[in-house]
Amino acid sequence: MNIALGQSALFLGLLGALAGAGSLLVGLSSGRRSLLRAGQGYIWLVALGAVLATVAMQRALITHDFTLVYVDNNDSTFTPLIYRITAMWSDLAGSILLWALVLSGYLMAMWIRFRKRAYDPVVVWAKVTGYVIAAFFFGLMLTLSDPFTRVHGAVPTQGPGPNPLLQDRVLVAFHPPLLYLGLVGFTVPFCFAVASLVTGQVGQGWLFETRRWSIFAWTCLTAGVVLGAWWSYQVLGWSGYWAWDPVENSALLPWLTATAFLHSAMVQQRRAMLRVWNISLILSTFSLTILGTFFTRSGVLESVHSFTDDGGVGPTLLVFFGLVVAICIGLLVWRGDQLRTQGAIESPLSREGALLANNLLFGAFAFVVLLGTVFPLLVQALNGSSITVGGPFFDTMTMPIVLCLLFLMAVAPVLPWRRASGELLRQRLAWPAAAAAGVLAACVLAGLRGFWPLLVFTLAAFAGTSALRQLVVLVRRVGPRSIAGRSGGGMIVHLGVVLVAVGFAASHAYQHQALLTMSVGKPASFQGHTLVFRGTKTVTSSGRSSLIATVDVDGHAYYPAIEQFALSNQAVVSPAVHSTPAQDIYLALTSVPTAADPAAGVAVYATPLVMWLWVGGLVVVLGALLSLWPSGRPRAGPAEERSRGHGVEPHDSYGSVGTGEQETADLPEPGKTGVGAAV
């Protein structure tokens, strides 16, 4: 039943996507409104197909239906219910099914949002693009990566279960879905960008329609990346959280281009400039999600996160990526004349100048990450050699970019549009500069050393104080409710980024570690802490056996463990972590006591300020959610204002708060907040 239901549902989804795209295309070419109306309704078939296929897969996993190859490979009778549910996205075919489910949800939301604009060419072409993308993924599942393939021969009675690493924390129930909500979410802005190019309507319309979709997707992707780092820290036993792994980079790349887009969009909204930048960034963001999907699902790059592909999915994804890039470039060339604008940046010391620099920096960051990720593939393709590009390359190349971005985070929000005077900058940056100098002095007096971390702390104080200043003045001028809006939310995002930067710098520069051989009852010293090994015990539960050590650290008990799953040969290290705002103590077993050697090997790490990474990530997500909150009536772009005869540019609230006449002029009316970009 599960196989029949699942495969029928996939066919229904593919049929709905093809019929919807065909109906809309014929309706556009013939001008028949009945076909345009009918074309909208096929989204129900796409969504129904994705939902029914998901129900069939979940039913198969929950009931241990080992007639499915997917269940046989990823389930066992010992697997707890929560991990049976999450097993749907623990392997290749199921992860593509999750992608199709999330995509159909976004397409349904797009249909609901724009249902009253059934005859708008931009909306119609956006839906056609969405249908084509959905058809590709449903077709992929029906051909090369069928999650409902039947087991040939005797039906097994037991499977190996999910990867043991995916059965250690319930974070696996949230981390991948959030990543997919983020990555797949950029499909909607991509569809509208393509539609605007096809129709030639490349002005402000597509940007206005997709702003909230972009921020929501960016928020989910940010939350997914942060949770992924937390999972790595809590589960893998290496005390790290970011290894520049190819799959980690695959999520980071679209995040970088999307962040650049959200900033750059403000310039087009305010000055009708950077059209090529904005549409290229959103096209690049979607293209990079497809490239990342190829990296993850092709097996060409080694990663603890990647899937094994033995059915041709990787080459198909690569061809799809190539087609997407070729079509995007072709559309940009075709509409190049219409995308060019007459406006020019009058001064580098202006908000648009700073945001253009921001684009260049994020672009450079993305290029470095992409180069380091694909370089081993290029070398292998050229001469057959196998090389790796590790953390030192990425750290060395990206650190200067991060420092420049921190500086821009402080300066850009206080800059006015068009040009700024030196006196204005001195006035608005006096307190942030003083705070930065104070933090640097305090760090030196506290005995902290190291050029890079001290520079990060200084610039973080500069940027953080600038964001706080903006928030304070905004609340004074507009009222407390202005926090829940685009300007307030954007500054809260900046505060979160500052916390992440501080946590990252401190945890990298000042971490201490040691590998201790500990006998029962004998104390050991580490960085001013006293550790005492109290012994081990074995705890057996359904399908797993855990050898748990007890180690006292300054009188507090820690319980690092090594877990062995009954149906897997892989032993999993389960670290013990005690977090405080100042420092984390992290313990991981490296060897267990035996009759011949009763001592235990314990890796111990003291990592300062790492908690602020997670706090900062939470603040970033909170700020992004606040920026989605309705913040007053929308303001028109410059072209719309001029068409009404006002000749006055609209307000953009991002960073336009402070003291002085020019800042006051930027503020919205009392009781209203502005409509600048959120991040």
Residue ranges and their predicted role:
Residues M1-R33, L45-L48, L52, F66, ...:
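Contiguous transmembrane helix-bundle modules in multi-pass membrane proteins
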Residues F11-G22, L28, S95-A229:
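A conserved hydrophobic secondary-structure block that centers on an alpha-helix together
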Residues G22-G39, F66-Y70, V102-A126, A193-T210, ...:
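Membrane-interfacial helix termini and the short, flexible loops that connect transmembrane helices
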Residues L45-I62, C220-L227, G496:
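A generic, lipid-embedded transmembrane alpha helix
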Residues M1-A9, R32-L36, R59-A93, D146-P176, ...:
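Membrane-interface interhelical loops and short amphipathic "cap" helices
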Residues A50-N73, T77-T79, T86-W111, L140-R150, ...:
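Transmembrane-helix bundle segments that line or gate the permeation/cavity pathway
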Residues L516-A600:
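Soluble non-transmembrane domains of integral membrane proteins
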